[in-house]
Amino acid sequence: MRAGELNFSSPARANPKRKKQIMPNTIKLHRVLRASPETIYRAFLDADAKVKWLPPNGFTGKVHHLDAKVGGTYKMSFTNFTTGKSHSFGGKYVELVPHERIRYTDKFDDPNLPGELQVTITLKKVSCGTELNIVQEGVPDVIPAEMCYFGWQESLVQLAELVEAEIPD
């Protein structure tokens, strides 16, 4: 897979005869950021930072709680700034390897968005910063994979703006 490619796997998409069965998608993203793994790791686990970069364009975000430890939970909501409609989601931190790996679950409060997503973030120090890989598994078919991918792209632009800024104290 090349950087910036949409990569999703869904047996329902591969075999049109299986359309009636709900099959989750997998979204994979790759990015290199001009920031240290430590800074990026912190941006994923700090409530104030997440509100700054995670909501896609046109949305505001709120962290209701975030307990960044293995077994700890979090709850967030995104609100469409134009319509005022909110959707909330939360999950549990499954694995935290400082500055290298974050694994957590995601589950929407909306019963029309079923299932539990698994998200894996990997960070690798490279010569010009950090290689960031994101794998989001279990995205329900009711969420078009390309829209999920598009939302992540917007969020990662905002993440780059946050972590790549060099502002003197």
Language model regions located:
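Hydrophobic/aromatic beta-strand elements that line small-molecule binding cavities or substrate pockets
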Residues: R31, V63-L66, F89-E95, L117-K124
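Short beta-edge strand/loop motif at the mouth of beta-sheet-based domains
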Residues: K28-L29, D48-S86, I167-D169
